[in-house]
């Protein structure tokens, strides 16, 4: 009987000592700085190539592989949240505002920058799906990295950004794991930095105001609706910095909301039933009118040159067009403005 109790006691002790419990402890810092102190970054881009993302050649960020110590089957993922205002988007990713001129793209995630999640909006989102540690001790880390973005059209300038709170990452236990009273959230601030921003553009060589004398014609030269006759021609010439692609938009000065391809005649015109169309070079399709804006992707914006041309030019042809309302002879006047976008 005595030996039986000794055997049972030995087995009980063996089973007891193999039992392990999921555990977590915080070994990081609750406040963390992103990027080097007083960083300085320089880049050159076309004036209207906006938003322009600075590619510094290295990550402006913070990473730490040892923020939480975990063991015994503990399961952990990560959520992230950005507190800065959303001022735009790029390829589905939010651009967050720092100043009127400078914004940020932000990634959050596990320790490796390459696995970071592109952040959008201001809600908590899953930035690392997670894993479960085995019956051993390991750590869970995190990372944050950013890229500065130029937001507005401007001349070459230097922009200084002060230290700014970005947002937070929190540890997310799952699969029955619990953090208890352990610190789960860490915060991030972007260190102050300077952007040395150099922009490239073009200079207009032709006068900024161009008067095109329209030829006199007879109504018989435009017998049917849609018929056209060349009325006049002119050219625009520019001198550009290397690498600049020029785009242009025509705007109807009399009716700025006009998005058609027929220019509205001014109130000084006395002819009716006739309009004006503008063609470039040898194109067979007339140009349409758009908003007076240099923004990339502006409605009815068209490409004037490629980035390899430093002295681009365009030949413009103005044509009378029968609008189908019955032509009454008289004077014809129209005003169109040109807005160049340097991309």
Swiss-Prot record:
Residues 23-199 are annotated as: Receptor-binding lectin domain. Residues 1-22 form the signal peptide. InterPro entries: Adhesion_dom_fimbrial, Adhesion_dom_fimbrial_sf, Adhesion_dom_sf, Bact_Fimbrial_Adh_Pro, Fimbrial_adhesin_lectin_dom. Keywords: Disulfide bond, Fimbrium, Lectin, Signal, Virulence. Changing residue 110 to L: 80% reduction in binding to N-acetyl-D-glucosamine. Disulfide bonds join 75-132. Residues 287-307 are annotated as: Disordered. It is found in: Fimbrium. A carbohydrate binds at residues 65-66, 110-111, 138-141. GO terms for molecular function: carbohydrate binding. Residues 200-343 are annotated as: Fimbrillin-binding domain. One of its GO terms (biological process) is cell adhesion involved in single-species biofilm formation. One of its GO terms (cellular component) is pilus. It holds the Pfam family Fimbrial. Its main location: other. Belongs to the fimbrial protein family. PANTHER family: FIMBRIAL SUBUNIT ELFA-RELATED, TYPE 1 FIMBRIN D-MANNOSE SPECIFIC ADHESIN. This is F17g-G fimbrial adhesin. It comes from Escherichia coli.
């Amino acid at each position: 009987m005595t030996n039986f109790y000794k055997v049972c006691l030995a087995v009980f002790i063996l089973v007891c000592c193999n039992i392990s419990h999921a555990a977590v402890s915080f070994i990081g810092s609750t406040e963390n700085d992103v990027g080097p102190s007083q960083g300085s970054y320089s880049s050159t881009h076309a004036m209207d190539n906006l938003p322009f993302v600075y590619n510094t050649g290295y990550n402006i960020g913070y990473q730490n592989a040892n923020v939480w110590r975990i063991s015994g089957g503990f399961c952990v993922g990560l959520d992230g949240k950005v507190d800065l205002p959303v001022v735009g988007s790029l390829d589905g990713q939010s651009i967050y505002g720092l100043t009127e001129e400078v914004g940020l793209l932000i990634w959050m995630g596990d320790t490796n920058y390459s696995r970071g999640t592109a952040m959008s909006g201001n809600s908590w989102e899953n930035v690392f799906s997670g894993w479960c540690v085995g019956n051993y001790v390991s750590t869970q880390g995190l990372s944050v990295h950013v890229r500065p973005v130029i937001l507005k059209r401007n001349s070459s300038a230097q922009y200084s950004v002060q230290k700014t709170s970005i947002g937070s990452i929190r540890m997310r236990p799952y699969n029955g794991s619990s953090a208890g009273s352990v610190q789960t959230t860490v915060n991030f601030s972007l260190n102050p930095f300077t952007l040395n921003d150099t922009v490239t553009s073009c200079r207009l060589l032709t006068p900024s105001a161009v008067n095109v004398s329209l030829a006199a014609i007879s109504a018989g030269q435009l017998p049917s609706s849609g018929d056209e006759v060349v009325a006049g021609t002119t050219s625009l010439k520019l001198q550009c910095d290397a690498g600049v692609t020029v785009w242009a938009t025509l705007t109807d000065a009399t009716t700025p909301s006009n998005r058609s391809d027929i220019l509205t005649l001014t109130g000084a015109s006395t002819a009716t039933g006739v309009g004006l169309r503008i063609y470039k070079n040898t194109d067979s399709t007339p140009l349409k009118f758009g908003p007076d804006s240099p923004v990339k992707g502006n409605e009815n914006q068209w490409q004037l040159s490629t980035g390899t041309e430093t002295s681009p030019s365009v030949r413009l042809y103005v044509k009378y067009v029968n609008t189908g309302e019955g032509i009454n002879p008289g004077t014809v006047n129209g005003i169109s403005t040109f807005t160049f976008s340097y991309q």
